[in-house]
Amino acid sequence: MRILISNDDGVTAPGIAALHAALVDYAECAVIAPDQDKSGASSSLTLDRPLHPQTLANGFISLNGTPTDCVHLGLNGLLPQTPDMVVSGINLGANLGDDVLYSGTVAAALEGRFLGGTSLAFSLLSRQPDNLPTAAYIARRLVEAQSRLVLPPRTVLNVNIPNLPLEHIRGIQLTRLGHRARAAAPTKVVNPRGKEGYWIAVAGDAEDGGPGTDFHAVMQGYVSITPLQLDRTFNDAFEQLDGWLEGLL
């Protein structure tokens, strides 16, 4: 088993070190991750400049690009052998509901969708690393079990882990994505020379976070697993759109 590990918090982040440590005695692991924090990079690719991989003292590969860049190169010639699966994380911070649209953690896993093994994205619901051992243990268990999992092609699992010690985790729930409310307005700032700028506000609170959602599961102390696919087609809208388009051309 060959696993490519990436993230969006950066190659020196504690989460990716914990994930590598949890998997390195189970599989042949390669780490390719951004040289700096790329949270919110989504599935962006760097197309305006060359990418320069650098191997660090611990063997991790640092790349001056996005999480998707890292996985794309890892699957297309940077590594001596093609990985069997991609594992992303462990992100310090939730990737719930609408977060998956922006998340570099989820995007890195999605870039591995063409492989035979199901890719997984792991996120811990905390900006602090105290409960990374919990997340690392759960990641190991799920990766070990992946060999007996058969899912439709191009399915990725988005895993969110409550910020709790392992003994307080109540179990695992399969969930759908909830939805967040609209984020607050950006914060306007002015530098000492009078130039205006803006800080993007934090994500909105859960607007659709009832039973069955990823929000509800983690708030109840359960690990949330949401299967994702790239197809965002809203089939239920076809009937209304057919009527709307009739006679336009």
Curated annotation (Swiss-Prot):
InterPro entries recorded: SurE, SurE-like_Pase/nucleotidase, SurE-like_sf
- Alphabetical keyword list: Cytoplasm, Hydrolase, Metal-binding, Nucleotide-binding
Cofactor annotation comment = Binds 1 divalent metal cation per subunit.
Report which reactions are catalysed by this protein. a ribonucleoside 5'-phosphate + H2O = a ribonucleoside + phosphate
Question: What subcellular locations does the record give?
Answer: Cytoplasm
Which residues of this UniProt protein bind a divalent metal cation?
A: D8, D9, S39, N91
Q: EC? A: 3.1.3.5
Spell out the molecular function terms from Gene Ontology.
3'-nucleotidase activity; 5'-nucleotidase activity; exopolyphosphatase activity; metal ion binding; nucleotide binding
GO terms for CC?
cytoplasm
Q: Which cofactor does it need?
A: a divalent metal cation
Q: What is its main location?
A: cytoplasm
The record's PANTHER family line, in alphabetical order, gives: 5'-NUCLEOTIDASE SURE, 5'_3'-NUCLEOTIDASE SURE
Q: What does this protein do?
A: Nucleotidase that shows phosphatase activity on nucleoside 5'-monophosphates.
Similarity comment text for this entry? Belongs to the SurE nucleotidase family.
Protein known as: 5'-nucleotidase SurE
